[in-house]
Regions:
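Bacterial Sec-dependent N-terminal signal peptides
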Residues: 1-29
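Short glycine/proline-enriched turn or capping motifs at secondary-structure junctions
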Residues: 10, 14, 112-119
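Central antiparallel beta-sheet cores of small beta-barrel/beta-sandwich binding domains
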Residues: 29-96, 122
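Short, conserved beta-turn/loop elements at beta-strand boundaries and strand-helix junctions
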Residues: 51, 104-105, 126
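Short coil/turn motifs at secondary-structure junctions
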Residues: 60-62, 115, 126
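Short, exposed beta-strand-loop hairpins at the edges of beta-sheets
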Residues: 98-101, 105-117
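Short beta-strand-to-coil "C-cap" segments at the C-terminal boundary of structured domains/repeats
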Residues: 120-126
Length: 126
């Protein structure tokens, strides 16, 4: 009877670890893809590079924007959100950012000093 309980515990442990890894992997991939920033027609591509999640400018109709420039870096998962750094092109500075993924929308909260600003990026189909 004890051997049966040991086998049952091993199976349950394996199933738990498998479910945890699937949930963790899907959270890791939730930011990946193309995102429209809003006002300007700028598209950011979020992907893994050297085992880190980064965001690069893929396209923009704004001539001041350097296509290919990294604007999101040091992203790491913390619970239900991602934290890292975002580059403000107009100010030419890096700021802290929190990102929450909600289906087809990314909610970004950018912190600078005692102030913060919120943005929404929408999933791009192209």
């Amino acid at each position: 009877m004890i051997w049966f309980l040991k086998i049952k515990m091993k199976v349950l442990t394996t199933l738990f670890l498998l479910m945890f890894s699937i949930v963790y992997t899907s959270a890791q991939q939730s930011l990946e893809g193309l995102w429209k920033t809003g006002k300007e027609e700028t598209i950011i591509e979020i992907s893994f590079s050297n085992e880190q999640l980064i965001g690069k400018i893929k396209f923009s109709n704004n001539k001041e924007v350097d296509v290919g420039k990294i604007i999101l870096k040091d992203l790491r998962s913390e619970g239900n959100k991602w934290v890292g750094k975002i580059y403000a092109i107009k100010r030419k500075e890096w700021y802290n950012v929190e990102i929450i993924s909600k289906e087809e929308v990314l909610e970004l909260k950018i912190s600078f000093g005692l102030m913060s600003r919120s943005l929404q990026w929408k999933k791009s189909k192209s």
